[in-house]
Design a protein with these regions (language model features):
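Short, surface-exposed beta-strand-loop junctions and turns on beta-sheet-rich folds
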Residues: 51-53, 72, 142-144
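A generic "binding-loop/recognition-motif" signal
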Residues: 49-50, 132
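Alpha-helix boundary recognition
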Residues: 11-12, 58-59, 102, 119
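Extreme N-terminal tail/first-helix region
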Residues: 1-17
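Amphipathic alpha-helical interface surfaces
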Residues: 7, 53-56, 94-97
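A short, aromatic/hydrophobic, helix- or strand-capping loop or linear motif
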Residues: 21-23, 67-73, 107-117
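Charged, gly/pro-rich active-site loop segments
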Residues: 77-151
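Short beta-strand segments
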Residues: 15-49, 57, 63-69, 77-82
């Protein structure tokens, strides 16, 4: 079994990821967000800069991410676990990022997004996580044995 293929299928086949952030004191916080992948190392989402996870990222850019199918039968769950660094996008990165986010949004039957949706005076901003490491559960090494992969 190609575990990189497993990771690609999970990222391609889901629409929500869970961000694991921490504030300056190290207090953890998790948040599910709709995401738009660009390949398997750049993941985009929109959030309010006032949301707890956005405030945490402003103080500490490092985060963990998990994408999984919450409808999998008990005992058959699989996910992609990731380490990343995130930022609110500006300038050319914002222009490119909103194109990617909008394209994926439309492909999922949702509305298109524009720069006006993620700049002042709008209440949302566009964020990107740059993933440095991916892991999946190795079904040959249960229970919960994660194996690093390159999707």
């Amino acid at each position: 079994m190609d575990l990189g293929e497993v990771a690609r299928a999970i990222i391609d086949g889901n629409r929500y990821m869970v961000l694991g952030t921490a504030d300056e004191g190290g207090r953890p916080w998790v948040s599910p967000v709709y995401y738009a992948p660009s390949g398997y190392s750049d993941l985009y989402w929109v959030s309010s800069p006032d949301a707890q996870h956005s405030r945490n990222l402003a103080a500490r850019r490092e985060l963990s991410i998990v994408v999984f199918d919450s409808q999998a039968p008990v005992g058959e769950g699989q996910g992609v676990y990731m380490s990343a660094v995130a930022e609110q996008l500006m300038d050319a990165d914002l222009e490119r990022g909103i194109e990617i986010f909008s394209h994926v949004s439309v492909s999922h039957g949702a509305r298109p997004w524009t720069l006006e949706d993620v700049q002042e005076p709008a209440s949302l901003r566009l964020y990107r996580a740059r993933v440095s490491e991916h892991w999946v559960l190795d079904p040959e090494r249960r229970p919960d044995q994660r194996t690093r992969v390159r999707p």
